[in-house]
């Protein structure tokens, strides 16, 4: 199926870099499309919705969920065309020099320019390799912690020894009834301070162990207990639990760039080699966020915003060489004049 409509810019990836690219391209009057693989916008922040984020300039500490909400609202300011659940698998060019984006669904998208903002690629959590485990994903087998409240007063076992697993254990220890942490190696690999906090807490750390079996409840809808096996002695022990959390890392899906039929230079066979202005080796194709690699690259959400603005400005000049290099700042931009009046009136009404 083809989307015959030609867009000025198509943004691939709906995380912070992609959402800000979408906002800024709308600000620059560009006909914009945003394509996201997941069912909702927000990107990797979905992995830690209740974690506090401190390093966005001018923004007081904010939860990942709230920041996502604000980023999505801002990204949709200029009513871009949005495609969710759409995985782009290849990028080519047609005879007219326009980009042709092929989706796994068979959909074809056309665009004058492209901004790749896929972060570290499509991240799929590594699943628990136990037969039949997937049936518990609708009940109490978790691959992320979306709400700490869900685990209040419950017995929880976390499998994993990296930063995320240790962070989750420390977050849940004060609210859960009991926290177990099982890890197949003899020491955790998370940040030293976080590991120290964990081992000095009430959580029970079970090193050199791994989940061997899931034992179902009487109705077979939930996991009632887990059987751990000691990796050194092969001894087993069963623990009654309410919730199981698995954090064994993520699998990176880099199919998009691997199938890019263009002379796109990469770093480490994954990241897009670019410039500080977000340009790639392919004219008209830009990168923003963690997927962009160059000397001096800042891997922060704040850095992604600058990448996005640079990418959009370059895309605008690529399409319209006579266009200004940058957009008018928002405080003096006529685009926001009507909305500013509405916001000021809202503030006046709230203060009455």
Curated annotation (Swiss-Prot):
Cofactor, free-text remark: Binds 1 FAD per subunit.
Positions of disulphide bridges: none
Keyword Flavoprotein assigned: yes
Reported cofactor(s): FAD
Entry binding sites for FAD: 36, 44, 48, 88, 123, 290, 331
One term of GO molecular function: NADP binding
The keyword Transmembrane belongs to this UniProt entry's keyword annotation: no
Name of the top EC class for this enzyme: oxidoreductase
Matches recorded under InterPro entries: FAD/NAD-bd_sf, FAD/NAD-binding_dom, Fd--NADP_Rdtase_type_2, Ferredoxin-NADP_redctase_2
Xref: Pfam families: Pyr_redox_2 (PF07992)
Taxonomic lineage of the native organism: Bacteria, Bacillati, Bacillota, Bacilli, Bacillales
The name this protein goes by in its record: Ferredoxin--NADP reductase 2
Reactions listed under catalytic activity: 2 reduced [2Fe-2S]-[ferredoxin] + NADP(+) + H(+) = 2 oxidized [2Fe-2S]-[ferredoxin] + NADPH
Family from the record: Belongs to the ferredoxin--NADP reductase type 2 family.
Key words, A-Z: FAD, Flavoprotein, NADP, Oxidoreductase
Assembly mode: Homodimer.
Documented EC number(s): 1.18.1.2
